[in-house]
């Protein structure tokens, strides 16, 4: 999911952290095109679990633009749907707060790869990290497996995560 781009690093405890995820993802696609004839694949399945599923959603439209038969692409995700409510008694919408914070750090120079969704949420493009908001802008078929159980959410957004 951490596919954004931030030109300048963030210094954390004396170490520069670079956020160039979109460049890295595009370089992976370039490698597949050059070394594995990806453009002529007769079946492409993008998949991921939790944040990886969000990455698959985010990049599926881009992948369709670089293959000769866009209908050959399918997204199969295990989880990756963070429901918008105060999860397990948390004092606030933990998923929303986390996605907003992540987006404000890593998506400085670029928004998501989902242009249609970005246009639907001007100034609040972080909403596109949620399948609930980006679904209509994804052109590939999606098969959701275990969509309402996300192990990251269970472990990190529970009420115990917010105790003093």
Which stretches of residues belong to each language-model region?
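C-terminal His-loop and adjacent cap/lid subdomain of alpha/beta-hydrolase
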Residues: 1-164
């Amino acid at each position: 999911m951490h596919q954004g781009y931030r030109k300048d690093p963030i210094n954390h405890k004396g170490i520069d952290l670079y956020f160039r995820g979109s460049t890295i993802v595009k370089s992976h696609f370039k490698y597949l095109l050059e070394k594995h004839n990806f453009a002529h694949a007769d079946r492409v399945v993008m998949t991921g679990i939790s944040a990886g599923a969000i990455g698959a959603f985010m990049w599926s439209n881009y992948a369709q633009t670089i293959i000769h038969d866009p209908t050959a692409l399918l997204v199969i995700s295990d989880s990756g749907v963070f429901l918008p409510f105060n999860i397990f008694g948390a004092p606030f919408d933990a998923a929303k707060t986390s996605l907003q914070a992540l987006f404000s750090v890593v998506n400085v120079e670029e928004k998501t790869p989902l242009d249609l969704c970005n246009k639907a949420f001007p100034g609040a493009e972080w909403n596109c990290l949620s399948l609930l908001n980006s679904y209509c802008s994804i052109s590939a078929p999606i098969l959701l497996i275990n969509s309402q159980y996300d192990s990251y959410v269970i472990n990190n957004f529970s009420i115990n995560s917010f105790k003093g």
